[in-house]
């Protein structure tokens, strides 16, 4: 079966004379041969400024990397912007900056949601790469492709795939690295709606340009193309060959699940995960697996398919189960919203948490406690609030802005005091400031709802005074209860 992918693509080459470069890619190539737009920009800076930057470039790059590591968003963006005109940003720093931006927006808005500011910054990085071709490594293109895909910007990812393919001949001849880049480009083209023939050209290039040395990537391409374009016979043979060849990586699993789920093949994605002899070396990232669980639940409105994946992880990679536990607990609340059966939800959560407490590898995170606070709100049961606090104390967990948002939501529906509410609010302000996020209307309205939802509190007058103080601070006005 090892030569299976090569056989498929040799047929494609014979039938369509497939080549990587077509008119679109030839047009895109001019982006990389045109003179850099910044070629004369540095002359607008004084000689002293230019000399200072040259002498201190390593220190400035270190400062930028330190700011990213500390998650100082405002400072990072400012430092990056100040360094960009001098052309001293190296490939590794650029790659870290892309991941810094995208991971932050995914943390705030979830997968598939992007704000205009982040999108503008990504587009700006792409322009920088066009002007400074030396930073456009294979890893750079892969990160750019994955970023736009994670943000569901498939049309843009498809365009970047064309750019990366046109740039391929300028990259160092490392077959494994280039093979993976071809797979990322194929992923983007499939999700961008490319035809079977267009996808086949990329698959053919893996064999043709890399001289048949990347068998696993060839097989992955066959598996993706023939699953999406619904040739079950070839798809099954490709999958069997991949399992037998034992060369899959976590990167491949991420790509396969991303393509299948985004093309509506959620059950095939779950089947791939469970039936490919995956282990800690080639399981998808936990971020991708959590996303798959969410999409499986949306497709089946049941926790059962999720629990089979959870049990698989428990057997082959128990170190990852905390994130999966958090996801399943959160989705159990969506199940409750459908069933409206408090006893069923309570029994499931209690049984599930008890099961996890017997697993020695299970180490709750602050997200686990946050989820318990959310459960307390949904079920209007103070015992889950207490369970969350106990977990924070027992495991020494560090609360985040999400923790205090969740607490304020819980205090809307459960017995609460002015002291509890004011402490949660002050901590929320502090945590938001620490990650360079301003207090927005949604936070103000959450505080209003929290205080106005229980007019019969014993200390409601103190609550109203606190609310007016906060509203005055942010220039807001009280809304009628």
UniProtKB/Swiss-Prot annotation:
Protein task: Mitochondrial RNA-binding protein involved in mitochondrial translation. The cox1 mRNA is one target but it is not clear if ppr8 has a single or multiple targets.
Cited InterPro entries: Pentatricopeptide_rpt, TPR-like_helical_dom_sf
Subcellular location: Mitochondrion
Disruption phenotype: Exhibits growth arrest on glycerol medium.
UniProt source species: Schizosaccharomyces pombe (strain 972 / ATCC 24843)
GO CC terms: mitochondrial matrix; mitochondrion
Keyword terms of this UniProt record: Activator, Mitochondrion, Protein biosynthesis, Repeat, Transit peptide, Translation regulation
Protein name stated in the entry: Pentatricopeptide repeat-containing protein 8, mitochondrial
Keyword Metal-binding: no
GO biological process, one term: mitochondrial gene expression
Presequence range in chain numbering: 1-55
Intervals holding PPR repeats: 137-172, 365-399
Gene transcribed to yield this protein: ppr8
């Amino acid at each position: 079966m090892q030569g299976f992918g090569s056989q498929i693509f040799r047929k494609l080459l014979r039938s369509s004379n497939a080549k990587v470069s077509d008119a679109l890619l030839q047009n895109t190539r001019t982006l990389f041969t045109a003179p850099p737009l910044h070629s004369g920009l540095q002359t607008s800076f004084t000689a002293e400024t230019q000399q200072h930057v040259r002498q201190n470039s390593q220190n400035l790059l270190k400062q930028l990397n330190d700011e990213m590591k500390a998650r100082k968003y405002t400072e990072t963006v400012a430092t990056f912007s100040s360094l960009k005109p001098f052309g001293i940003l190296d490939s590794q720093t650029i790659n870290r900056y892309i991941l810094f931006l995208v991971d932050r927006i995914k943390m705030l808005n979830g997968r598939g949601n992007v704000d205009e500011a982040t999108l503008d910054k990504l587009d700006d990085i792409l322009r920088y790469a066009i002007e400074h071709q030396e930073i456009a490594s294979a890893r750079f293109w892969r990160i750019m492709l994955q970023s736009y895909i994670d943000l569901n910007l498939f049309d843009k990812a498809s365009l970047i795939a064309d750019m990366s393919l046109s740039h391929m001949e300028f990259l160092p001849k490392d077959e494994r690295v280039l093979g993976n880049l071809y797979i990322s480009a194929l992923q983007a083209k499939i999700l961008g709606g490319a035809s079977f023939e267009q996808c086949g050209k990329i698959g053919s290039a893996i064999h043709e340009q890399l001289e048949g040395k990347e068998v696993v990537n060839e097989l992955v391409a066959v598996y993706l193309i023939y699953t999406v374009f619904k040739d079950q016979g070839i798809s099954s043979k490709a999958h069997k060959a991949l399992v037998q060849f034992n060369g899959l990586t976590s990167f491949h699993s991420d790509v396969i699940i991303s393509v299948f789920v985004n093309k509506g093949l959620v059950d095939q994605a779950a089947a791939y995960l469970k039936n490919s002899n995956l282990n800690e070396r080639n399981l998808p990232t936990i971020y991708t697996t959590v996303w798959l669980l969410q999409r499986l639940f949306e497709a089946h409105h049941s926790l059962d398919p999720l629990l089979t994946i959870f049990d698989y992880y428990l057997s082959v990679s128990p170190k990852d189960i905390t994130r999966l536990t958090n996801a399943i607990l959160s989705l159990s609340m969506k199940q409750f919203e459908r069933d409206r059966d408090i006893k069923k939800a309570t029994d499931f959560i209690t049984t599930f948490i008890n099961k996890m407490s017997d697993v020695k590898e299970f180490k709750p995170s602050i997200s686990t406690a946050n989820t318990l606070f959310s459960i307390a709100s949904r079920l209007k049961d103070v015992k889950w609030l207490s369970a969350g606090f106990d977990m924070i104390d027992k495991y020494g967990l560090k609360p985040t802005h999400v923790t205090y948002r969740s607490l304020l939501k819980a205090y809307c529906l459960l017995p609460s005091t002015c002291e509890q509410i004011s402490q949660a609010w002050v901590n929320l302000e502090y945590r938001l400031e620490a990650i360079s996020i301003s207090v927005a209307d949604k936070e103000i309205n959450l505080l209003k709802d929290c205080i106005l939802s229980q007019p019969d509190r014993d200390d409601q007058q103190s609550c109203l005074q606190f609310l007016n103080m906060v509203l005055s601070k942010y220039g807001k006005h009280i809304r009628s209860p």
